[in-house]
From Swiss-Prot:
Sorted UniProt keywords: Acetylation, Calcium, Metal-binding, Muscle protein, Repeat
Organism: Esox lucius (Northern pike)
Pfam families per record: EF-hand_7 (PF13499)
Official protein name in the record: Parvalbumin alpha
PROSITE patterns: EF_HAND_1 (PS00018), EF_HAND_2 (PS50222)
Binding of Ca(2+) 1, residues: 50, 52, 54, 56, 58, 61
Other remarks in the entry: This is the major component, having an isoelectric point of 5.0.
UniProt: Ca(2+) 2 binding residues: 89, 91, 93, 95, 100
Family per record: Belongs to the parvalbumin family.
Length: 108
């Protein structure tokens, strides 16, 4: 995922959500450069976040989403993780599919 994004943008985006409780997916996606990407590239980033390659991003993987962008990214709090999941999980199955992720990135 990192090779599709600019290091400066990643740093800026991570700095913006450094404080616990400050994570906002819309702001983060825009700052990190995801929003400007094609659907295809967004799906490549999804695959990088989907650590177990299940085809879904589960709540556990979502907690560590910032680490997919940089090793020093913090863990999301439980509240942030749940809010992120709720925003993305359109079909209510408790996890985020690749199309749900792409929709979430581009709807903001």
């Amino acid at each position: 995922a990192k090779d599709l994004l600019k290091a400066d943008d990643i740093k800026k985006a991570l700095d913006a959500v450094k404080a616990e409780g400050s994570f906002n997916h819309k702001k983060f996606f825009a700052l990190v450069g995801l929003k400007a990407m094609s659907a295809n590239d967004v799906k490549k980033v999804f695959k990088a976040i989907d650590a177990d390659a299940s085809g879904f991003i589960e709540e556990e993987e979502l907690k560590f989403v910032l680490k997919s962008f940089a090793a020093d990214g913090r863990d999301l709090t439980d509240a942030e993780t749940k809010a992120f999941l709720k925003a993305a999980d359109k079909d209510g199955d408790g996890k985020i599919g690749i199309d749900e992720f792409e929709t979430l990135v581009h709807e903001a």
